[in-house]
A protein has these predicted regions:
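Zn2+-dependent metallopeptidase catalytic core
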Residues: 80, 325-349
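The catalytic-center signature of Zn2+-dependent metalloproteases
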Residues: 354-375, 437-494
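Conserved catalytic/binding loops enriched for acidic/polar residues
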Residues: 460-876
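Sec-exported extracytoplasmic/periplasmic mature domains
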Residues: 335-346, 448-449, 453, 489, ...
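Auxiliary tRNA-acceptor-end handling modules of aminoacyl-tRNA synthetases
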Residues: 25-322, 355-410, 414-431, 435, ...
Length: 876
């Protein structure tokens, strides 16, 4: 009974305990149980992957993890199968002869990350084919599936299973051609040298990572042993070489920009895609223009005619490594293009900014940022490539690289081309503002390329030569209708012209430049598709087709048919322009010592300038030579006012020939004995130029043949051309005169070329060159090219066209050029039998020489006997 009482008492007391205290005890118990369970939770693969590691993490659209010289990608599942642009940029280098900071070894390319079971595959995406037909599109997708370039094992899912983690190190620390540190624009590549390289993985490292909302980047330090081949061995053998490469992964929009179809009648960079049409048209090649995605921020205001800023302006960041004095001129070279965009309603469409000082997110090697980069290189060059979204042609990134030695080259240009008329440039170093204008010109030309404008070599070809000595005309138009032409400075202007107000330099922008920007970037609101834009774009070009200011002339490389599309020339008449140019060169040689002798004690400047005088003379002669057998070429659509081609008139061709032949009469000014007598000793340039001119004249026979075949009236035939040369060459012999040394050399050169063009006797074994070579120009002497390379580095054909300074063995072979969107045209000389003509000429010359063998001086007679011997040997 007592025990029962105690039990009931305890129970009653328990029932009377405070409910809040009881609740607290229950919570404590539950918390203890939860903690125990938490301790018991297993570590995930994701946790184990990074456990105990010193991990650096960068969060962007992909999260990057760096540790133990490895880089892991944490790729969200929602990013799988998305289009990503991958590009590689040189950030640092131990030797910029293999590539300069800021250069990219290849165009960025499209990739996708695709999951396959327990792996992630990196796939290369093809964007070169399309169809609007649903069924064809399905088959195209299965026929052009993205190729697997690399496979990675999935190491883990993140803890909420929204992303996969895999090791990308093997891809980013390897020798991949598309991600290489060896630039195709490098000095070594331009020399045509063979590069043997061995990648050294054990000496290569992951150096850094960055992540942003729409892009991530990885820096890889790559190390090689490099050997550079030279004749008979190696110039460099197993040299250590390292470069830091910045690899950018950019997430492209799911919906590409609406593309604009290109037109071959205007010089815009483009790429081609193949359309599989369903309307019975079969395959159709379409050309997609490259352009920035400029859209008005306020469409209503834009349509009212107000100036409107774009949603996303074009921004160029200027390298802080440039000499400080260049900075404002670089800004000017970029922002001068604002004028062209303002004409089509955009305000502040293109902006130049200095490298940010306190922005941790800014990275000039990140492909997201477009930059003007400085390269401390001996090369005298600048370039402005751009990189695109291949799905739409949208320009994603563009960078201008300016090589330091360009300032040397532009100073020589300015002096050479304008010193006779402009006293201010008669100095060994240009005044800062004059040099600044030269820098701004180079920058504006290269920025034009980044905006997608190609070279327009016909920019000055319709300007009357005399207009280039007219103050009113030159102040309005400068030297050309397009700064995308290679029309440098006003070499037409004569002493006294500047005082009259004649402009010495190109315009800031030309009429064609405004027109090209308008065609490429003006919004077409009324068109809902790219196809609907075509009639409007076509009209914009067709309505300008009768105005020569807006003519587009393609840059010609190996084959040069069109004399109006030649680098460095000015004006509509090469003969008259070159006459003015030659007078100015003679004026320079006559006065150079009085202008700069006190500042050029070691003759370095004057020696270099003399070489540039010879180079300039070769250019002027070549402009004239191009008229012989020349054909003006135009891309034409039905209804356009210009013809597709038009031959140079017989009168102009004969005028050009007479100019060149008359130049041969007196080239002694090139040796300028009074000027050069204190210079280091050198061989006679006049004699070398004699040979080059006659070689050039005779090399145009094939071009004359094509031109006469295409002429609609009064053709200048190859027979007439040879007859005109023959009359000039043998005129002193017919007159019974004593021959000068020049006349004897001319006759010997002519006879040698004539023999090479025949198939008789010893000529059967001769190399059939010269008289049957229709693509010749006045050859630049190899010693002159060598001196130029020593002074300016290798200046390639992309910067100087056919007047580049590459050695003959460095010249890259080009594919046959065709019309349309390609570089030029491919024409074959008509199969007109000419051997009998050459044979007849040899017989006629033999008769003339035999009849004149006893005339003239003893030297002249010995010369005739040698000619007779050579002819008889050829006719055996």
């Amino acid at each position: 009974m007592k025990k029962l009482y105690l039990f009931l008492l305890v129970a009653l007391c328990g029932a009377m305990i405070n409910p809040a205290v009881a609740k607290k005890k229950n919570k404590k118990k539950a918390s203890t149980e939860a903690t125990t369970k938490k301790k018991e939770k297993k570590e995930t693969k994701y946790d184990k992957l990074f456990k105990g590691k010193k991990v650096t993490t960068a969060k962007g659209f992909i999260t990057l993890h760096q540790f133990d010289n490895k880089v892991y990608f944490e790729l969200p599942l929602k990013v799988l199968n998305r289009d990503i642009l991958l590009g590689s940029t040189i950030a640092e280098t131990t030797d910029n002869q293999f590539g300069c900071v800021g250069e990219k070894s290849s165009d960025p390319f499209l990739i996708r990350f695709v999951q396959r079971d327990s792996t992630i595959t990196l796939r290369r995406v093809q964007a070169g084919q399309f169809s609007d037909d649903r069924e064809i599109k399905k088959r195209l997708q299965s026929s052009t599936m993205p190729a697997i370039a690399e496979t990675f094992e999935i190491k883990a899912y993140n803890n909420d299973s929204t992303a996969v983690v895999f090791d990308m190190t093997s891809y980013l620390l390897s020798d991949k051609k598309m991600l290489s540190p060896f630039s195709p624009y490098s000095l070594i590549e331009m020399m045509g040298a063979n590069i043997d390289k061995n990648f050294e993985k054990e000496s290569s490292f992951i150096q850094g990572i960055k992540g942003f909302e729409d892009n991530v980047s990885v820096r890889s330090l790559l190390t090689y042993k490099v050997s550079v081949g030279a004749k008979g061995g190696y110039a460099v053998k197993n040299m250590p070489f390292s470069a830091v490469m910045n690899r950018s992964f950019i997430l492209l929009p799911e919906k590409p920009m609406r593309h604009r179809y290109a037109d071959p009648r205007i010089g815009i960079f483009e790429h081609s895609i193949v359309e599989f049409a369903s309307e019975g048209r079969g395959l159709r090649t379409r050309h997609i223009a490259h352009r920035w995605n400029l859209e008005p921020s306020d469409s209503a205001a834009y349509l009212r005619g107000e100036l409107v800023e774009p949603k996303k302006p074009i921004v160029f960041y200027i390298d802080d490594a440039f000499p400080l004095s260049w900075n404002k001129y670089i800004h000017k070279g970029v922002e001068v293009w604002q004028k062209a965009f303002e004409k089509i309603g955009f305000k502040n469409a293109i902006i130049a900014k200095d490298f940010p000082k306190n922005d941790p997110n800014f990275d000039p090697e990140n492909i997201k940022y477009s930059c003007i980069r400085y390269a401390p290189s001996t090369v005298a060059n600048a370039m402005g490539p751009s990189w695109i979204d291949p799905r739409s042609g949208e320009i994603i990134n563009a960078s201008v690289t300016v090589y330091h030695n360009i300032v040397q080259l532009v100073q020589y240009w300015r002096f050479l081309q304008t010193a006779p008329a402009d006293k201010e440039v008669r100095d060994v170093v240009l005044r800062e503002d004059l040099l600044g204008d030269c820098i701004a010109y180079v920058l504006s030309h290269e920025v034009g390329h980044t905006l997608s404008l190609m070279h327009n070599m016909a920019g000055s070809s319709s300007i009357p030569v005399e207009s280039l000595r007219d103050p009113k005309f030159t102040q309005e138009y400068g030297t050309t209708y397009s700064i995308m032409d290679y029309a440098r400075n006003n070499y037409i202007a004569q002493p006294g012209d500047k005082e009259k107000g004649v402009r010495m330099t190109p315009p800031e922008l030309g009429a064609y430049d405004y027109y090209a920007i308008s065609w490429l970037y003006k919004p077409i609101f009324e068109a809902k598709t790219s196809e609907e834009e075509i009639p409007i774009l076509d009209k914009w070009i067709s309505e300008k087709s009768g105005d020569p200011k807006y003519r587009y002339g393609k840059q010609q490389f190996k084959r040069r048919f069109d004399p109006s599309s030649v680098e460095e020339d000015l004006g509509d008449d090469p003969v008259k322009a070159s006459e003015y140019g030659r007078r100015n060169l003679q004026y320079i040689l006559k006065h150079i010592n009085e202008w700069v002798a006190d500042k050029d004690k070691d003759f370095e400047f004057r020696t270099a300038l003399y070489d540039e005088v010879v180079y300039g003379y070769v250019r002027y002669l070549s402009f004239v030579l191009a008229d012989i057998g020349g054909i003006y070429l135009n891309e034409r659509y039905d209804g356009d006012q210009r013809p597709s081609y038009q031959t140079v008139s017989k009168e102009q061709q004969k005028k050009a020939l007479n100019f060149l032949l008359n130049e041969l009469k007196d080239l002694s000014w090139l040796d300028a004995n009074e000027t050069l007598k204190e210079f280091p000793i050198r061989t006679s340039v006049a004699m070398q130029m004699e040979n080059a001119i006659i070689d050039g004249i005779l090399s145009r026979c094939g071009a004359v043949s094509i031109c006469s075949d295409k002429a609609t009236s009064a053709p200048y035939t190859q027979k007439e051309y040879l007859a005109d040369i023959e009359r000039f060459v043998w005129a002193p012999t017919r007159a019974g005169k004593t021959l000068t040394d020049t006349e004897m050399r001319l006759q010997m050169n002519y006879l040698t070329k004539l023999i090479e063009g025949s198939v008789t006797g010893v000529a059967k074994n001769a190399t059939r060159k010269g008289i049957t070579d229709m693509y010749g120009i006045i050859e630049i002497p190899e010693w002159l090219k060598a001196a130029s390379r020593e002074r300016f580095g290798i200046v390639s054909e992309e910067f100087m066209g056919c007047f580049n300074n590459k050695h003959a063995e460095m010249q890259a072979a080009r594919l046959e050029e065709i019309s349309g969107f390609e570089d030029g045209v491919d024409l074959k000389a008509p199969l007109e039998p000419m051997e009998h003509v050459y044979f007849g000429e040899l017989k006629k010359i033999r008769s003339l020489v035999a009849a004149s063998a006893s005339t003239g001086s003893a030297d002249t007679q010995r010369h005739y006997r040698l000619l007779l011997y050579k002819i008889d040997q050829a006719l055996k």
